[in-house]
UniProtKB/Swiss-Prot annotation:
NCBIfam families: hisF (TIGR00735). The active site is at residues 11, 130. Heterodimer of HisH and HisF. It comes from Escherichia coli O139:H28 (strain E24377A / ETEC). This is Imidazole glycerol phosphate synthase subunit HisF. Coiled coil: none annotated. The keyword Nucleotide-binding does not apply. Gene3D superfamilies: Aldolase class I (3.20.20.70). It is found in: Cytoplasm. Its EC number is 4.3.2.10.
């Protein structure tokens, strides 16, 4: 059995790490490199960096900090933000990133997933899915351009359909960003995760809602996700990664202990 992964998420805007609630009202958390170094030292299995306004601004992720992060950490990291071409991806990988993640550009051009997977291998192609639960219809819908709340739009895709589509096209991993839960720290959407797990046959990463150590345990135990991504509980030092891993190990979760 592969070890489950704990993955801090760093949303980047204007060269700094920020955090919002339900993808809105972002506050500045701090500088990118010191935070990345801290999480690596605490025992994170990998890091994810989202340049949250790159796609909505029509630009690619700011590459200047990618190489600086690669110099100070020795764990894998993934970078996302406006990657729309093979050249964009090649540059980010050449600066030291281990994986690239695409979200809004994949919705605009689903063939991008296949082209990236064919060029770089499925192992480094992650597809992020921003999913919103509509209480009126009882359905989960995929959103696009979520880094800018004035441009966020609901797409034609229902989440379960898009999960299956991106796998057919070559996604090697899926990060499910559950927007309703984002930043509110009341737990992952286990019902949605279970539904996605049934149709997801590549590594699945849960994102949105972690507030306690028990929330991580529930995601691993009840929804069988491969990794759990979180931001505010780590940024605000509500949960220490080393202590979280020790707790999960006592609960029988296969986890890498530093």
């Amino acid at each position: 059995m592969l070890a489950k992964r704990i993955i801090p998420c760093l949303d980047v805007r204007d060269g700094q790490v920020v955090k919002g609630v339900q993808f809105r009202n972002h506050e500045i958390i701090g500088d990118i490199v010191p935070l990345a170094k801290r999480y690596a030292e605490e025992g994170a299995d990998e890091l994810v960096f989202y340049d949250i306004t790159a796609s909505s601004d029509g630009r690619v992720v700011d590459k200047s900090w990618v190489s600086r992060v690669a110099e100070v950490i020795d764990i894998p990291f993934c970078v996302a933000g406006g990657i729309k071409s093979l050249d964009d991806a090649a540059k980010i990988l050449s600066f030291g990133a281990d994986k690239i993640s695409i979200n809004s550009p994949a919705l605009a051009d689903p063939t991008l997933i296949t082209r990236l997977a064919d060029r770089f291998g499925v192992q480094c192609i992650v597809v992020g899915i921003d999913t919103w639960y509509d209480g009126e219809t009882g359905k989960y819908h995929v959103n696009q351009y979520t880094g800018d709340e004035t441009r966020t739009r609901v797409t034609q895709w229902e989440t379960l359909d898009w999960v299956q589509e991106v796998q057919k096209r070559g996604a090697g991993e899926i990060v499910l960003n559950m927007m309703n839960q984002d930043g509110v720290r009341n737990g992952y959407d286990l019902e949605q995760l279970k539904k996605v797990r049934e149709v997801c046959h590549v590594p699945l990463i849960a994102s949105g809602g972690a507030g306690t150590m028990e929330h991580f345990l529930e995601a691993f135990r009840d929804a069988d996700v491969d990794g759990a991504l979180a931001a505010s509980v780590f940024h605000k030092q509500i949960i220490n990664i080393g202590e979280l891993k020790a707790y999960l190990a006592t609960q029988g979760v296969e986890i890498r202990i530093c």
